[in-house]
Amino acid sequence: MLIGLTGTPGTGKTSVSKLLEKKRQWKIIHLNELIKEEHLYTEVDEKRDSVVADMELVRSRLPELINEMEKEPANKVVILESHLAHYITDIVIVLRAYPPELKKRLEKRGYSEEKVNENAEAESIDLILAEAFEWCDKVFEINTTGRTAEETAGDVEKIIDSLLSGKEEQLQEYGPGSLDWIDSVP
């Protein structure tokens, strides 16, 4: 089963996915790293200190990689971790964070003020959640505000375990749309 773990930068995707990889031995594709390592991008955006992913190249590369991971007998889950994961997977978990807290997280990373504000605004207007609705069949939402990566990983596990066991009805608390941070837009 391929699951996307997406969200605005700073919501905890990488920390959570690393915990799940260690605890559950689920395979993780850190998409942003893959894009950079395999040059699956069209250009370097110097201003944003990032690359512009070539989604066609990404989509053509992933099936082979995922098939290899799924061949391992004990592996039932592959997690695609990236703020772009919702463009690729049919099932996605969107990690969210209250924008003022998100700003603090991104400032600690040393992001420029412009990049911090751009990401906080994107989170305020539910940008990735809205895109996930457009691209994905199943969307779940987890609030990471004031929570540890371990706590958030527990929620991700619950969602994935429920999906694997066909008990999706147990996931109402993760239904998208419960978080509204529009008031945090400056």
Curated annotation (Swiss-Prot):
It comes from the Archaea. It catalyses: AMP + ATP = 2 ADP; ATP + H2O = ADP + phosphate + H(+). Residues 108-118 are annotated as: LID. ATP binds at residues 10, 12-15, 109. The keyword rRNA processing applies. Residues 30-53 are annotated as: NMP. Its EC number is 2.7.4.3. Keywords: ATP-binding, Kinase, Nucleotide-binding, Ribosome biogenesis, rRNA processing, Transferase. HAMAP family: Adenylate_kinase_AK6. Belongs to the adenylate kinase family. AK6 subfamily. This is Putative adenylate kinase. It comes from Methanosarcina acetivorans (strain ATCC 35395 / DSM 2834 / JCM 12185 / C2A).
